[in-house]
UniProtKB/Swiss-Prot annotation:
Signal peptide: none
NCBIfam families in the cross-refs: L12 (TIGR00855)
Any GO molecular function: structural constituent of ribosome
Similarity annotation: Belongs to the bacterial ribosomal protein bL12 family.
CDD domains: Ribosomal_L7_L12 (cd00387)
Naturally occurring in which organism (per UniProt): Vesicomyosocius okutanii subsp. Calyptogena okutanii (strain HA)
Protein name: Large ribosomal subunit protein bL12
Length: 124
């Protein structure tokens, strides 16, 4: 007897009618003691956790210093602890990250401080 390949078997099944395929499946279930019914993963669906993970670290990005450049420089200097020249250079190079990995509370406080002096800020 010649060995049948998977492709030969698939081609033979493709040429069969639907009724013949149903009978073939039934015969295979009987011969091998298996069931062709689909198993529904009900337990898996029930275990899915729908909680949203809230970000807890933010990078504060100065996108624009607006019209009050001097006030923004002072605020950046106060926030970062940098010198006047470094703060000025940082503000003038906007968009720039003012602080990395800040907590949510700290990031919101810095954002508020910068917006109060007219800067545009983004939390990432």
């Amino acid at each position: 007897m010649a060995k049948l390949t998977n492709e030969d078997i698939l081609n033979a099944i493709a040429d069969m009618s639907v009724i013949d395929v149903v009978e073939l499946v039934s015969a295979m279930e009987e011969k091998f003691g298996v069931s062709a019914t689909a198993v529904t993963p009900v337990a898996v669906v029930a275990d899915v956790d729908n909680t949203v993970v809230e970000k807890d670290e933010f990078d504060i990005m100065l996108t624009s210093f607006g019209e009050k450049k001097v006030a923004v420089i002072k605020a950046v200097r106060s926030i970062t602890g940098l010198g006047l020249k470094e703060s000025k250079d940082m503000v003038e190079s906007a968009p720039v990250v003012i602080k990395e990995s800040a907590s949510k509370i700290e990031a919101e406080d810095i954002e508020r401080q910068l917006k109060e002096v007219g800067a545009s800020v983004e939390l990432k």
